[in-house]
């Protein structure tokens, strides 16, 4: 009887532990997803020239996040219009001078970009130097990046082919988001198994059946993180999954790094690169694996930046354009927050924050909010003004002295539609170049 009781207690303890871990993972997923405030949407998918022109990404629906995308024609059907539409999305246009990925001040407009598989060299050449600069600015400014197969190759310094260092290619056109070589696996039209190390950050989000294995992941000419003969693994690279594969004379990838992450510094986004193709699967562990990579990438978004300190009685003019290269005073973009700090003195009877637009550009909706001790958002404070228009006044009666934060939010946004090339915008497209405003605080 005692033995039966002991076994029952042991089983109950194991079940409790499993439930606790499942809850912990669910909380980790929810925490990452809760930090989307101040971004236009979570995901932008690149299916541009040379890449798979995918119109759906199952993991976005699985996670419940919003996505927009660009999808070109197939390589054999490409035309000048594909280049025009791709440049409009990534490089900019009259109504959006720095492209969809970036706000007017250079902050990331999406939390993450996902780059599909396909032909990395063709895509890199099609986007050119300007497109590469936009992608680099996006990641450096805090936007995260996930690339599979070609999307992993193109994010590296160069690709390393079978001939060793003599086969080093594309160093002049790749995006250099990760300072290492993506080495060809030489494996085509096959399946691989991925093994997650015990310390893999992806295990924060799912347990993958408890064995840390993801089976039957499609692989077609993908890559691994080169570590050794020609260049050591870049400092800061985190192995997230390894290949499990019965090596042959031609293909020797067992135990090699199949998925890896990299974050250059505290202000940059996180880059996650995967040599295989889990992205099209709509169920099971491969879907969870793709979702985990997305979550880990988005977890690398840095904390929002403070634009500056508002001083008593001074009017701060936020009217610069992208071309002025002065982000601390640049206009606000659609669904973006601008954060400011104020120092309320002792014995202050009230603090009045005022917001207004500029003549000829007041037909936008800006809102205002404030909070003591932490950044203000619509959902964490009752001190807010959300009426139509730009002009606002927010009075804080008998405020406690100390550090407060004031935030401006641009309610006006574009109307997003889907067509032949993926997303296109209608409606208030002028908001993409930013809304100018003036903000001040006065103490009594």
Briefly describe each language-model feature range:
Residues 28-40, 47, 54, 136, ...:
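Extracellular ligand-binding/catalytic regions of CAZymes and related secreted enzymes
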Residues 52-164:
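Helical hinge/lid and interdomain linker segments adjacent to catalytic or ligand-binding clefts
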Residues 140, 155-209:
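Class I SAM-dependent methyltransferase SAM-binding "motif I" and its flanking Rossmann-like core
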Residues 74-105, 161-169, 210-231, 307-328, ...:
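Surface-exposed intrinsically disordered loops and tails
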Residues 366-433:
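Noncatalytic accessory or regulatory domains flanking protease catalytic cores in secreted, cell-surface
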Residues 192-267, 279-282:
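Catalytic beta-strand/loop cores that center a nucleophilic Ser/Cys/Thr
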Residues 329-379, 399-403, 443:
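Acidic, Ser/Thr/Pro-rich low-complexity intrinsically disordered segments
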């Amino acid at each position: 009887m005692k033995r039966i009781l002991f076994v029952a207690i042991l089983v109950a303890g194991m079940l409790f532990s499993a439930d606790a871990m499942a809850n912990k993972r669910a909380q980790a997923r929810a925490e990452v997803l809760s930090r989307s405030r101040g971004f236009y949407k979570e995901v932008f998918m690149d299916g541009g020239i040379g890449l798979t022109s995918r119109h759906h990404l199952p993991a976005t629906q699985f996670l419940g996040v919003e996505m927009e995308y660009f999808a070109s024609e197939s390589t054999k059907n490409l035309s000048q219009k594909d280049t025009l539409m791709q440049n409009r999305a990534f490089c900019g246009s009259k109504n959006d001078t720095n492209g969809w990925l970036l706000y007017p001040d250079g902050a990331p407009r999406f939390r993450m970009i996902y780059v599909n598989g396909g032909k990395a060299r063709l895509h890199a050449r099609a986007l050119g130097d300007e497109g590469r600069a936009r992608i680099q600015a996006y990641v450096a400014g805090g936007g995260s990046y996930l690339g599979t197969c070609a999307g992993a190759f193109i994010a590296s310094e160069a690709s390393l082919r079978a001939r060793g260092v003599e086969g080093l290619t594309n160093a002049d056109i790749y995006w250099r988001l990760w300072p290492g070589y993506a080495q060809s696996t030489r494996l085509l039209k096959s399946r691989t198994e991925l093994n997650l190390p015990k310390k893999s950050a992806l295990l924060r989000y799912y347990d993958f059946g408890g064995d840390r294995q993801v089976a039957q992941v499609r692989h077609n000419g993908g890559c691994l993180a080169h570590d050794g003969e020609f260049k050591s693994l870049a400092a800061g690279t985190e192995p997230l999954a390894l290949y499990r594969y019965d090596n042959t004379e031609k293909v020797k990838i067992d135990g090699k790094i199949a998925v890896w992450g990299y974050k250059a510094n505290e202000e940059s986004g996180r880059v996650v690169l995967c040599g295989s193709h889990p992205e099209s699967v709509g169920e099971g562990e491969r879907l969870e694996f793709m979702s985990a990579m997305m979550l880990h990438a988005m977890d690398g978004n840095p904390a929002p930046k403070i634009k500056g300190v508002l001083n008593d009685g001074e009017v701060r003019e936020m009217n610069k354009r992208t071309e002025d290269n002065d982000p601390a005073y640049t206009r606000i973009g659609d669904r973006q927050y601008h954060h400011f700090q104020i120092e309320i003195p002792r014995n202050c009877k009230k603090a009045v924050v005022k917001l207004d637009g500029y003549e000829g550009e007041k037909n936008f909706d800006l809102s205002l909010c404030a909070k003591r001790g932490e950044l203000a958002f619509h959902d964490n404070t009752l001190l807010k003004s959300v009426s139509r228009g730009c002009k606002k006044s927010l009075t804080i009666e008998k405020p406690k002295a100390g550090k407060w934060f004031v935030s401006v939010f641009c309610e006006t946004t574009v109307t997003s539609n889907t067509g032949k090339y993926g997303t296109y915008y209608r409606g208030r497209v002028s908001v993409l170049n930013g809304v100018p405003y003036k903000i001040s605080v006065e103490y009594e």
